[in-house]
């Protein structure tokens, strides 16, 4: 159960041999391969050039994965051109993968899902240790604003992670103008994706209209401030997740019938934010269910607003308070 809770919290399992802190991720082994997610645009082309220069000096190899989404005429030629640029820079291996973008989930989300599936496939095929993506500080600021508009809590304002363990984003501290200037100074010819100027896409409207207005009305530095906010929220979120994991491991017990229980007294002693995280963590780890905020608050009411309520039936799980325990049963 300990490992399942840690996995659900997206945290490393504590190191039983050390100082009880999280185990440190292993560095890249000598000769390890990293793949650049290359579109041919200025950001990814600059990253490809940087990797081609730095990788041999750091003792690892660099290749590229070019994903052809097939969403516009000439996409195969664009992908082939990006692959040629990667090879000219000295990257290898260079893979080109054509993907099918499903209609479900919106065009941006569907394209991203297809792209990441291709990344996974390329990593398996080449035994690559990491995939490097060229998202910039501008991309991060846009992501934070989009999360703010969704209003789905602090997690939606954390932006993109610099390091997920599989994906690395080394350019999150750089502005987009820097990568374009680098390409110009280096004689590299990036491809400009027409979709990046299409206002049909929400992110394009944020980029071309919302951020410029904020900079104009509030002064320069808005993008940097949004990126700093995301970083601070990630730090806070990791701390709260660690506390939630520790609390869950202290309060949880498991029965032979598949149910899981939490001690009510221990949950009630903590602040609401931590209590709700523990509830979400346990339900996610044990039942694979992601509780919405309204469902989480309904469960928390069995602790903080207890007046003899009956069982609570939620998607995938049934919750009962009895004998000082909050017990979660899987729906059968």
UniProtKB/Swiss-Prot annotation:
Any matching Pfam family: ATP_bind_3
InterPro entries: Rossmann-like_a/b/a_fold, TilS/TtcA_N, tRNA_Ile_lys_synt, tRNA_Ile_lys_synt_N, tRNA_Ile_lys_synt_subst-bd
Binding sites annotated in the UniProt record for ATP: 39-44
Single GO biological process annotation from the record: tRNA modification
Enzyme nomenclature, EC number: 6.3.4.19
EC main group: ligase
Subcellular location: Cytoplasm
Any Gene Ontology CC annotation: cytoplasm
Family stated for the protein in its record: Belongs to the tRNA(Ile)-lysidine synthase family.
Swiss-Prot/TrEMBL domain comment: The N-terminal region contains the highly conserved SGGXDS motif, predicted to be a P-loop motif involved in ATP binding.
Annotated protein name in UniProt: tRNA(Ile)-lysidine synthase
The organism of origin for this protein: Leifsonia xyli subsp. xyli (strain CTCB07)
Highest classification ranks of the organism: Bacteria, Bacillati, Actinomycetota, Actinomycetes, Micrococcales
